């Protein structure tokens, strides 16, 4: 079996029983289970959810996305070996640690396979909860243009690139395009302030004003848990994006939970500590791949300018990236995952068939 066969690229064509269209995102696909299968699994597996809670199978792929495009490699290597397994393993580790520390639960109920989660349907909070400990990336680019206020927070003069900020900053943005909210532009991924969210509690899908405090608390505490754990491996947790939502437990009590993924190389910037002390930035996240793309193509503006999306999509479609680049990404993701979980990562030899076999034999979900 060659390298390309070990990569799960297409993850929305599995024969999982569902009565709804499969939702296929950039990296994950979601299969909503039938009410009958959801109820059966809740009863048989003892999940702490209402008996009629909708469940889904969430399958992560090994695809690599950046700048809103999915990128492919040479020689049929259309994904990054081990990437999906690494992302899930990292999130699983942090979600477990959050629960042990008494923070909050996640949407994950079961992990049948390294690439698969069984999740409870959540009502998402409509913000990307972003926390920043260092000034870098888009924030630094805006700072160099004279901006000093970010999401209603004023930061001091005289900061330098990649410098640690005086305190952890919460700089949320909209999740999707929100309409009819005064003062909030109707566009995807727009920065919003705490006061914007307070004015539109319902519009951002919060159940109460006090839950705004709770999400900020869970964001800060989750950031600190991950930052402290990574510091033990001399890795710096630079910034990250969390997502939150609401679910009900078996007793019908609503609770705010972590959802999607947390503390991964896809959703965070992670730097090597020793290199940073020497004044160099070694990325241990997808940011390294983003920088490679910006340096690789002659006209980097295509990747940064949202008015050139058609050109950007064509660029990603027409250019096969060197296999060595895909393997460098693999080494980064697998390497940071093994540091986080403290053991060697098991990479599937035939991921698609393994998933089908386990969902058939242990969960009776294959048609």
Swiss-Prot record:
Entry's Gene Ontology cellular component terms: cytoplasm
Reaction catalysis annotation: 5-amino-1-(5-phospho-D-ribosyl)imidazole-4-carboxylate + L-aspartate + ATP = (2S)-2-[5-amino-1-(5-phospho-beta-D-ribosyl)imidazole-4-carboxamido]succinate + ADP + phosphate + 2 H(+)
Signal peptide: none
Pfam families linked to this entry: SAICAR_synt
Gene3D superfamilies per record: ATP-grasp fold, B domain, Phosphorylase Kinase, domain 1
Catalytic EC class: ligase
Keyword flag Ligase: yes
Biological process, per Gene Ontology: 'de novo' IMP biosynthetic process
Similarity comment: Belongs to the SAICAR synthetase family.
Name assigned to this protein: Phosphoribosylaminoimidazole-succinocarboxamide synthase
Native organism taxonomy: Bacteria, Pseudomonadati, Pseudomonadota, Gammaproteobacteria, Alteromonadales
């Amino acid at each position: 079996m060659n390298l390309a066969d070990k990569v799960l690229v297409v993850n929305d064509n599995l024969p999982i029983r569902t009565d709804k269209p499969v939702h296929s995102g950039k990296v994950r696909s979601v299969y909503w289970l039938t009410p009958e299968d959801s109820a059966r699994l809740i009863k048989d597996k003892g999940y702490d959810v209402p008996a009629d809670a909708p469940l889904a199978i969430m399958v992560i792929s090994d695809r690599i996305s950046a700048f809103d495009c999915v990128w492919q490699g040479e020689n049929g290597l259309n994904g990054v070996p081990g990437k999906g397994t690494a992302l899930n393993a990292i999130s699983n580790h942090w979600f477990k640690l959050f629960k042990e520390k008494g923070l909050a639960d996640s949407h994950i109920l079961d992990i049948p396979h390294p690439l698969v989660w069984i999740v409870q349907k959540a009502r998402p909070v409509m913000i990307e909860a972003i926390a920043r400990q260092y000034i870098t990336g888009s924030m630094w680019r805006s700072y160099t243009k004279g901006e000093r206020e970010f999401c209603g927070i004023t930061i001091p003069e005289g900061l330098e690139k990649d410098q640690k900020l005086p305190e952890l900053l919460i700089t949320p943005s909209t999740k999707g395009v929100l309409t009819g909210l005064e003062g909030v532009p109707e566009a995807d991924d727009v920065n919003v302030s705490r006061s914007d969210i307070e004015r539109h509690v319902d519009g951002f899908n919060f159940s109460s004003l006090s839950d705004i405090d709770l999400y900020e608390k869970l964001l800060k505490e989750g950031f600190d848990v991950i930052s402290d754990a990574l510091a033990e491996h001399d890795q710096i947790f630079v910034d990250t994006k969390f997502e939150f939502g609401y679910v009900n437990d078996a007793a019908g009590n609503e609770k705010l939970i972590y959802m999607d993924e947390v503390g991964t190389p896809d959703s965070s910037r992670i730097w090597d500590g020793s290199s940073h002390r020497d004044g160099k930035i070694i990325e241990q996240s997808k940011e390294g791949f983003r920088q490679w793309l910006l340096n690789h193509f002659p006209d980097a503006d295509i990747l940064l300018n949202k008015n050139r999306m058609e050109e950007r999509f064509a660029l990603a479609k027409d250019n096969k990236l060197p296999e060595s680049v895909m393997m460098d990404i693999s080494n980064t993701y697998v390497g940071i995952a093994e540091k986080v979980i403290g053991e060697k990562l098991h990479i599937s030899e035939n991921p698609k068939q393994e998933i089908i076999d386990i969902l058939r034999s242990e969960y009776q979900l294959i048609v």
